[in-house]
Every structure is written in structure tokens, then in C-alpha cells.
């Protein structure tokens, strides 16, 4: 009976001591993995930051090419009264004097060319 107790006690002590070693080893391994993960995340973050900076550097160049005044202003559609001195008819339309209808309102309307 004593041999069984001694054997059981010996196995128990070995299991506890080896379990502690495995626990410490697992903790160290987890620390290494998290450090590697952090370095990978830092690398990915730096790469993304570089890409965003490149895109941001290109944006002012595109903005300078097209200023606010270079956009097409609102235009007047077909059959709408226009000003003879300042025709704002859309492209493909011309500010002309009407032939029959509209002669009693304004003197010029936008018509197709």
C-alpha cells in the first residue's frame, strides 16, 4: 500500500512540476506570438499610412487642375427665354428671336441649332 502511495505521490509531483514548466513555456510562446502580431500590425499600419499619404499628395494636384470657375454653369433649356446679351443656353442650343409663338413675351428663346 505504501508503494502505491509513493508511486502516486511521485507521479503527482512530476505532473505538477512538468505542468508548471508547460504553463511558463505557453506563456512565453503567447508573448512571442503577440509581439510578432504587433510587429505585423505595425508593418501593415505603416504600409497603409504610406498609401494614404500618396493618395493625399495626388489630391491637391487634381483639385488645382479643375478650379471652381471651370465648371459648366447652369444652362437654359430649349424653348426657355434667354437674354440676347448674355445667352446661357445649353450646348447645342442658340439664343434666337422666335418666329411665331412667344413674340409677345420676351424677344429671345433658346432653340436647337
Curated annotation (Swiss-Prot):
Any one cellular-component term (Gene Ontology): extracellular region
Cystines in this chain: 75-90, 82-95, 89-110
Top-level taxon in the UniProt lineage: Eukaryota
Signal peptide: 1-21
Region entry Disordered, spans: 58-82
Domain notes: The presence of a 'disulfide through disulfide knot' structurally defines this protein as a knottin.
Keyword terms of this UniProt record: Disulfide bond, Ion channel impairing toxin, Knottin, Secreted, Signal, Toxin
Species, as recorded: Cyriopagopus hainanus
Sequence similarity: Belongs to the neurotoxin 14 (magi-1) family. 01 (HNTX-16) subfamily.
Molecular function GO terms recorded: sodium channel inhibitor activity; toxin activity
InterPro entries reported for this sequence: Toxin_22
Protein name in UniProt: U11-theraphotoxin-Hhn1a
Expression sites (tissue/organ): Expressed by the venom gland.
Biased composition (Basic and acidic residues): 58-69
Localization: Secreted
Function: Probable ion channel inhibitor.
Residue ranges the record assigns to the propeptide: 22-74
Any coiled-coil regions, as ranges: none
Amino acid at each position: 500500500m505504501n508503494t502505491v502511495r509513493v508511486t502516486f505521490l511521485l507521479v503527482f509531483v512530476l505532473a505538477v512540476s512538468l505542468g508548471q514548466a508547460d504553463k511558463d513555456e505557453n506563456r512565453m510562446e503567447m508573448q512571442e506570438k503577440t509581439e510578432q502580431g504587433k510587429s505585423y500590425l505595425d508593418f501593415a499600419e505603416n504600409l497603409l499610412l504610406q498609401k494614404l499619404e500618396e493618395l493625399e499628395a495626388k489630391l491637391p494636384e487634381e483639385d488645382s487642375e479643375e478650379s471652381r470657375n471651370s465648371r459648366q454653369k447652369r444652362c437654359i433649356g430649349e424653348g426657355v427665354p434667354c437674354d440676347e446679351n448674355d445667352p446661357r443656353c445649353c450646348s447645342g442650343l442658340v439664343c434666337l428671336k422666335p418666329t411665331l409663338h412667344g413674340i409677345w413675351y420676351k424677344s429671345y428663346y433658346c432653340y436647337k441649332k
